[in-house]
Protein backbone atom coordinates (compact mmCIF):
# COMPACT_ATOMS: atom_id res chain seq x y z
CA UNK A 1 0.00 0.00 0.00
CA UNK A 2 1.42 3.37 -1.06
CA UNK A 3 0.08 6.71 0.14
CA UNK A 4 0.71 9.92 -1.76
CA UNK A 5 -0.24 13.29 -0.26
CA UNK A 6 -1.81 15.53 -2.88
CA UNK A 7 -2.48 18.60 -0.74
CA UNK A 8 -1.24 19.60 2.73
CA UNK A 9 -2.88 22.70 4.19
CA UNK A 10 -2.33 24.22 7.63
CA UNK A 11 -5.59 25.53 9.12
CA UNK A 12 -4.48 27.76 11.99
CA UNK A 13 -8.04 28.82 12.86
CA UNK A 14 -9.01 25.24 13.78
CA UNK A 15 -5.48 24.32 14.90
CA UNK A 16 -5.07 21.40 12.47
CA UNK A 17 -3.47 20.18 9.23
CA UNK A 18 -5.79 19.13 6.41
CA UNK A 19 -4.60 16.51 3.93
CA UNK A 20 -5.90 15.18 0.63
CA UNK A 21 -4.29 11.84 -0.22
CA UNK A 22 -4.38 8.88 -2.59
CA UNK A 23 -3.87 5.28 -1.48
CA UNK A 24 -2.67 2.81 -4.13
CA UNK A 25 -2.92 -0.87 -3.28
CA UNK A 26 -3.15 -4.35 -4.73
CA UNK A 27 -5.80 -6.87 -3.76
CA UNK A 28 -8.52 -5.91 -1.32
CA UNK A 29 -9.18 -2.36 -0.18
CA UNK A 30 -7.15 -1.57 2.97
CA UNK A 31 -9.10 -0.90 6.14
CA UNK A 32 -9.51 2.59 7.57
CA UNK A 33 -7.28 1.65 10.52
CA UNK A 34 -4.49 0.38 8.22
CA UNK A 35 -4.54 3.63 6.23
CA UNK A 36 -4.66 5.65 9.45
CA UNK A 37 -1.65 3.81 10.93
CA UNK A 38 0.43 4.24 7.78
CA UNK A 39 -0.53 7.91 7.42
CA UNK A 40 0.36 8.61 11.07
CA UNK A 41 3.76 6.97 10.55
CA UNK A 42 4.39 8.99 7.37
CA UNK A 43 3.50 12.30 9.04
CA UNK A 44 5.14 11.53 12.42
CA UNK A 45 1.78 12.39 13.97
CA UNK A 46 0.21 10.83 17.07
CA UNK A 47 -2.42 8.29 16.04
CA UNK A 48 -4.98 9.64 18.52
CA UNK A 49 -4.86 13.09 16.87
CA UNK A 50 -5.28 11.84 13.28
CA UNK A 51 -8.82 11.77 11.88
CA UNK A 52 -9.69 10.23 8.52
CA UNK A 53 -12.79 12.08 7.38
CA UNK A 54 -13.46 10.03 4.25
CA UNK A 55 -12.01 7.42 1.92
CA UNK A 56 -13.64 6.90 -1.47
CA UNK A 57 -12.83 4.14 -3.95
CA UNK A 58 -13.77 4.28 -7.62
CA UNK A 59 -15.34 1.08 -8.94
CA UNK A 60 -12.73 -1.26 -10.41
CA UNK A 61 -9.78 0.93 -9.46
CA UNK A 62 -6.90 -0.09 -7.23
CA UNK A 63 -6.75 3.32 -5.57
CA UNK A 64 -8.76 5.33 -3.09
CA UNK A 65 -8.90 9.06 -2.46
CA UNK A 66 -9.19 10.39 1.06
CA UNK A 67 -9.28 13.42 3.32
CA UNK A 68 -7.62 13.47 6.74
CA UNK A 69 -7.01 15.96 9.54
CA UNK A 70 -4.21 16.09 12.10
CA UNK A 71 -5.03 18.12 15.20
CA UNK A 72 -2.50 19.82 17.47
CA UNK A 73 -4.35 18.82 20.65
CA UNK A 74 -7.11 16.44 21.70
CA UNK A 75 -9.31 19.11 23.32
CA UNK A 76 -9.65 21.03 20.04
CA UNK A 77 -10.32 17.82 18.13
CA UNK A 78 -13.21 16.87 20.44
CA UNK A 79 -14.58 20.41 20.27
CA UNK A 80 -14.61 20.56 16.46
CA UNK A 81 -15.29 17.01 15.22
CA UNK A 82 -18.70 15.38 15.17
CA UNK A 83 -19.29 12.38 17.42
CA UNK A 84 -19.74 9.83 14.63
CA UNK A 85 -16.40 10.82 13.08
CA UNK A 86 -14.67 10.35 16.44
CA UNK A 87 -16.24 6.88 16.73
CA UNK A 88 -14.88 5.94 13.29
CA UNK A 89 -11.38 6.99 14.40
CA UNK A 90 -10.94 5.62 17.94
CA UNK A 91 -7.81 6.17 20.00
CA UNK A 92 -5.52 3.10 20.14
CA UNK A 93 -6.55 2.24 23.74
CA UNK A 94 -10.26 2.61 22.97
CA UNK A 95 -10.16 -0.11 20.29
CA UNK A 96 -8.96 -2.70 22.81
CA UNK A 97 -11.64 -1.68 25.32
CA UNK A 98 -14.43 -2.08 22.75
CA UNK A 99 -13.21 -5.55 21.74
CA UNK A 100 -13.24 -6.71 25.37
CA UNK A 101 -16.80 -5.48 25.98
Curated annotation (Swiss-Prot):
GO terms of molecular function: structural constituent of ribosome
InterPro entries assigned: Nucleotide-bd_a/b_plait_sf, Ribosomal_eS24, Ribosomal_eS24_CS, Ribosomal_uL23/eL15/eS24_sf
Keyword Cytoplasm part of the UniProt annotation: no
Record SUPFAM superfamilies: Ribosomal proteins S24e, L23 and L15e (SSF54189)
GO CC list: ribonucleoprotein complex; ribosome
UniProtKB keywords: Ribonucleoprotein, Ribosomal protein
Protein name per UniProt: Small ribosomal subunit protein eS24
Protein species of origin: Methanosarcina acetivorans (strain ATCC 35395 / DSM 2834 / JCM 12185 / C2A)
Gene designation: rps24e
